[in-house]
C-alpha cells in the first residue's frame, strides 16, 4: 500500500473503488 492508498483507506474504507483508482 502506498501513501495515497493508505490515506484513502484511513479516510474512508467504504470507498474501495477510489482506493483502487488511485492505486492504478
Swiss-Prot record:
Keywords: Carboxypeptidase, Glycoprotein, Hydrolase, Protease, Secreted. Glycans are attached at residues 3, 11. Its EC number is 3.4.16.-. GO terms for cellular component: extracellular region. One of its GO terms (biological process) is proteolysis. Inhibited by DFP. One of its GO terms (molecular function) is carboxypeptidase activity. Disulfide bonds: none annotated. It is found in: Secreted. Signal peptide: none annotated. Contains both N- and O-linked sugar chains. The N-linked oligosaccharides are unique structures of Man(10)GlcNAc(2) and Man(11)GlcNAc(2). Deglycosylation does neither affect catalytic activity, pH, thermal stability, or resistance to proteolysis of the enzyme. Optimum pH is 4. Unstable above pH 8. Monomer. Removes acidic, neutral and basic amino acids as well as proline from the C-terminal position. Digests preferentially peptides containing a hydrophobic residue in P1' position, as well as arginine, lysine or phenylalanine in P1 position of ester substrate. Catalyzes also peptide synthesis. Belongs to the peptidase S10 family. This is Carboxypeptidase 1. It comes from Aspergillus niger.
Amino acid at each position: 500500500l502506498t501513501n495515497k492508498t493508505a490515506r484513502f483507506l484511513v479516510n474512508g474504507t467504504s470507498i474501495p473503488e477510489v482506493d483502487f483508482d488511485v492505486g492504478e
